[in-house]
From Swiss-Prot:
Protein name per Swiss-Prot or TrEMBL: Probable non-functional immunoglobulin heavy variable 3-35
PROSITE patterns to which the protein is assigned, alphabetical: IG_LIKE
Stretches for region Framework-1: 20-44
All residue ranges annotated as the Ig-like domain in the record: 31-117
Residues in the signal sequence: 1-19
Disulfide feature: C41-C115
Sugar attachment sites: N73
Region of interest: Framework-2: 53-69
Length: 117
């Protein structure tokens, strides 16, 4: 995997100002096998346009698994073999938003999806 994942557990405090990283996912739902969903992740509290971004997921009873990553400017994308050709990662730096278009969904794609830096 070309993109390293960094985990932020504490809000940074600089000169008395609290800077809280927020990543808010939306767009999930229940679909039939073969269906599609578009996931969104609204980012704030950091310079989104300078940051490589990733999607990970956690299937029921399992650990976190990397799904896809995109470079800061969207020019490079990478996918786990299990989703290659079915999922499309993209970003809109003007809206500080990351997307994951999920197509041809399978039962094994059932998971909680998170965006991470």
């Amino acid at each position: 995997m070309e993109f390293g994942l960094s985990w932020v557990f504490l809000a940074a405090i600089l000169k008395g100002v609290q800077c809280e990283v927020q990543l808010v996912e939306s767009g999930g739902g229940l679909v039939q096998p073969g269906g599609s969903l578009r996931l969104s992740c609204a980012a704030s509290g950091f310079t989104f346009s300078n940051s490589d971004m990733n999607w990970v997921h956690q299937a029921p009873g399992k650990g976190l698994e990397w799904v896809s990553g995109v470079s800061w400017n969207g020019s490079r994308t990478h996918y786990a073999d299990s989703v290659k050709g079915r999922f499309i990662i993209s970003r809109d730096n003007s809206r500080n938003t990351l997307y994951l278009q999920t197509n041809s969904l399978r039962a094994e794609d059932t998971a909680v999806y998170y965006c991470v830096r």
